[in-house]
Regions:
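Conserved G1/Walker A P-loop phosphate-binding module
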Residues: 1-82, 194
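Canonical P-loop GTPase G-domain recognition
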Residues: 3-15, 147-194
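Helical mechanochemical/support elements of P-loop NTPase systems and associated helical scaffolds
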Residues: 22, 48, 61, 89, ...
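Hydrophobic aliphatic residues
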Residues: 43-47, 101, 164, 189
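Conserved nucleotide-binding/hydrolysis micro-motifs of P-loop NTPases
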Residues: 58, 72, 79-81, 117-119, ...
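Conserved nucleotide-sensing/catalytic segment adjacent to the nucleotide-binding pocket
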Residues: 69-107
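Conserved C-terminal guanine-recognition region of P-loop GTPase G domains, centered on the G4
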Residues: 98-169
Length: 194
């Protein structure tokens, strides 16, 4: 599996008007400052594909990215758990995320991004419990691996697996800064697309 090209297609503000990709979709979920945009840009080898920002909570829409001329799509979900957002806005995002996850007939897997430096938040656990409850396949991806020593990476990978109730082999380590973890992610995508 290699990503040759990727492009932004559309933003959707409401789960009632989901974009029909007519292709497999992999959703990207995670808390607001976990590095979802950086992950998409790194995996797709395009630093300008998804807008990155030091301002958490920037993604407020479902953003669709077409990969390899429609072989599959990444769908970037709004980041959850951002404190500086009005309660009404958070409720709207929650409904949009839930509506997409339960309403997209093309969704094949959800990449749940976690910051390897920290224990999963209650919001992270709520997301994974939601996916378990609705029997939606997911993959845990630990971002920002460059921030820790190799030994600390292994220790924290084990901690994330334990906290989230999955085997350690189901936690993938990545660093968009050090450009590591891409091959394992490509292998995972190939598995998902079958």
């Amino acid at each position: 599996m290699v990503i040759k090209n990727a492009k932004f297609v559309i933003s959707v503000a409401d789960a009632k008007s989901l974009y029909n990709t007519e292709a497999s979709e992999i959703a990207i979920a995670g808390k607001s400052n976990v590095g979802k945009s950086s992950f998409i840009n790194y995996i797709c080898n395009n630093g300008k594909l998804a807008r990155t920002s030091g301002d958490p909570g920037r993604t407020r829409l479902l953003n669709y990215f077409e990969v390899n001329n429609g072989e599959f799509f990444f769908v970037d979900l709004p980041g959850y758990g951002y404190a500086k957002v009005a309660k009404g806005e958070k409720t709207k995002w929650g409904a949009m995320i839930e509506g997409y996850l339960t309403g997209s007939s093309n969704l094949k897997n959800v990449f749940v991004l976690l910051d390897i430096r920290h224990k999963p938040t209650d919001d992270d656990k709520m997301m994974v419990n939601f996916l378990f409850h609705y029997n939606i396949p997911f993959t845990l991806i630990a971002t920002k691996a460059d921030k820790l020593s190799r030994m600390q990476q292994m220790k924290n990978r084990q901690m994330l697996a334990s906290e989230m109730g999955v085997g350690v082999e189901n936690v993938y380590l990545t660093s968009s800064l050090n450009k590591t973890g891409k091959e394992a992610i490509f292998d995972r995508i190939a598995q998902i697309l079958g």
